[in-house]
Amino acid sequence: MIPGNRMLMVILLSQVLLGGTNYASLIPDTGKKKVAADIQGGGRRSPQSNELLRDFEVTLLQMFGLRKRPQPSKDVVVPAYMRDLYRLQSAEEEDELHDISMEYPETPTSRANTVRSFHHEEHLENLPGTEENGNFRFVFNLSSIPENEVISSAELRLYREQIDHGPAWDEGFHRINIYEVMKPITANGHMINRLLDTRVIHHNVTQWESFDVSPAIMRWTLDKQINHGLAIEVIHLNQTKTYQGKHVRISRSLLPQKDADWSQMRPLLITFSHDGRGHALTRRSKRSPKQQRPRKKNKHCRRHSLYVDFSDVGWNDWIVAPPGYQAFYCHGDCPFPLADHLNSTNHAIVQTLVNSVNSSIPKACCVPTELSAISMLYLDEYDKVVLKNYQEMVVEGCGCR
């Protein structure tokens, strides 16, 4: 990408995304002139311009709640659950969602604006006390969750496959128990566990099972208790061990297929949290495009198209979806007298009236009057997959203020 274009996109992003906040004044006039001169000069930037660009990228990353620019590993796998959740959250057309079997989790998302996914630390599977008597212990590293985020709920998702040639129907029931590990090893060599959730399932269905592990995750994150992990126990109710646990994908060793299958079938911990900013992840309905009358050289205040392509700022390697979005912007005159369609305030009307007789008083400005949110699916600095709701990212209406 041309360096000048990249700089221009960063400045446009800062103006559009941060406009209307105190950040808008972070670009001094001298800096604007310097950047413009560099762009017009063929794209070669001075050290001062490079520093300015870095400062703006840092500002934008802070707005996204990131300490530094993510540098994702090529081995990172985005769980299908997170992709499907993003698609459901982003209000895609119904006919485009036919391949999604899951239902939108209305209750967990109603109290959260952030969803994070975690895989267990596989290198800890061989530690003492990790597997005993059919119990599998899983340790999840939750250190990437910011301290300002409050966990509202959490679930452990396990994938299970149908057994085609299993036992008779009345012998095909299993119980799955999920425990919080209180002590990994005691004096007698056993784990001390606390039951979190349990369910009886039958082997004739292939699907994901979700278990509530909120109490444990809240203790680890809010109460700062030691995280010894979770334990999973699969019990055949008829004590038949031939198929016991083989269809529940809780360990790579139980999966005869390729590693590519394991990456999408392995246990998945999902946390729902809120950072205190903005609204929860309420599922949005698809908006109908606004019909605007064609205007001939209309210079009045109105909304204009502005598509932000994340590849233009080099962020497409860590932003999974969307590839970009229509941000829009407001531009145009606020002439006297202000017409009703210019969505003006009483103060703007008075200011425009005074300007008509005293030019030292500025006119009312064309600014966003209504903004909406977008959802972003991305990889954070720790290679964790995050779905987050960002407020005031799209201009829905303009007016003279």
UniProtKB/Swiss-Prot annotation:
Record-linked CDD domains: TGF_beta_BMP4_BMP2B
Q: Which Pfam families does the record cross-reference, listed alphabetically?
A: TGF_beta (PF00019), TGFb_propeptide (PF00688)
Q: Which residue intervals make up region (Disordered)?
A: 279-299
Note whether rRNA-binding occurs among the keywords: no
A GO BP entry is:
ossification
Q: Where is the composition biased (Basic residues)?
A: 280-299
Q: Which residues have a glycan attached per UniProt?
A: N141, N204, N238, N343, N358
Superkingdom of origin? Eukaryota
Signal peptide limits: 1-19
Write down the InterPro entries for this protein, in alphabetical order. Answer: BMP4_TGF_beta-like, Cystine-knot_cytokine, TGF-b_C, TGF-b_propeptide, TGF-beta-rel, TGFb_CS
Pro-region residues?
20-287
The protein's UniProt keywords, in alphabetical order, are: Chondrogenesis, Cleavage on pair of basic residues, Cytokine, Developmental protein, Differentiation, Disulfide bond, Extracellular matrix, Glycoprotein, Growth factor, Osteogenesis, Secreted, Signal
SUPFAM superfamilies assigned to the protein according to its UniProt record, in alphabetical order: Cystine-knot cytokines
Disulfide bonds listed in the record: C301-C366, C330-C398, C334-C400
Compartments, record wording: Secreted, Extracellular space, Extracellular matrix
Name the principal localization, coarsely classed: secreted
**Which GO molecular-function terms appear in the entry?**
cytokine activity; growth factor activity
Any Gene Ontology CC annotation: extracellular space
Q: How does it assemble?
A: Homodimer; disulfide-linked. Forms heterodimers with the TGF-beta family member derriere. Part of a complex consisting of twsg1 and chrd. Interacts with tsku.
Record's function text: Posterior-ventralizing factor in Xenopus mesoderm induction. Induces posteroventral mesoderm and counteracts dorsalizing signals such as activin.
Q: Which PANTHER family match?
A: BONE MORPHOGENETIC PROTEIN 4, TGF-BETA FAMILY
Q: What family does the Swiss-Prot or TrEMBL record give for this protein?
A: Belongs to the TGF-beta family.
Stated name of the protein:
Bone morphogenetic protein 4
Task: Give the source species.
Answer: Xenopus laevis (African clawed frog)
